Amino acid sequence: MLNSQSAMFPFIYLASQSPRRQELLKQIGVKYEMLAPEPGEDAESIEASHPNEKARDYVARVTLAKSEAALERHIERALPWAPILCADTTVSLPGHLGGEILGKPFDAVDAERILKLLSGKTHQVLTAVALRISPTSEPVSIVQTSEVTFTKLSEDHIAKYIASGEPFGKAGAYGIQGLGSSLIESITGSYSGIMGLPLFETSQLFNLAQVTYPLSTTHE
């Protein structure tokens, strides 16, 4: 753990292209610089699930793999050091195929399949966050789990939502902060976690790393 003599960091690197994560960091006043993947990096292989892998294990593994890739990127670019933040979000429907991992839809047909699975049911949204405090240490990480209950969706409702384009690029084929909010009856847990970055848990990691932001605290 860091102590009070450790360096303070005025910014972090965000190793994610998610506009929602950028928005959430701005919401709590965290300054960041992008450490986005290169176009040639193989994100699909990192995000591929293993046979019979549980959603919690999957999202934690993928986030740590992203952290390793981000560290390599940082070294290759010879950037000054600051903590590196990575995150990954997935959706799981308990009881369906042993808790099938419902990632980003491949196409409209897959989006329809996922939305029909979630219709009228309660599913889990799991977001893992990893913060690498120094280049020589393992990242500190957490997994936050929330529950989301969907209303019963009609065929027309699903078709219109898919036509909006919003399901694509989002785990579970919906976004809670957009049109997808009209699909949701209730949530239990972290709204920001469902968006892609649980701010309470992430702020605890920032405090540990002594990242400065408006409500930061120092840990002895």
Segments the model singles out, each with a brief description of its role:
Residues L2-V30, K121, T136, T145-E220:
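GST superfamily/GST-like fold recognition
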Residues L85-A87, A128-A130, Q177:
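Short beta-strand segments
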Residues P83, T89-H123, F150:
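Active-site-adjacent loop/tail segments of enzyme domains
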Residues L25, T63, D88, A111, ...:
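Residue-level signal for inorganic ion chemistry
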Residues A108, R113-K116, G120, A128-S141, ...:
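Anionic-ligand binding region
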Residues S92-L93, A130-S134, I184-E185:
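Short beta-strand-to-turn element immediately C-terminal to the catalytic PLP-Schiff-base lysine
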Residues M1-P83, L93, L97, N207-E220:
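N-terminal polybasic phosphate/anion-binding patch
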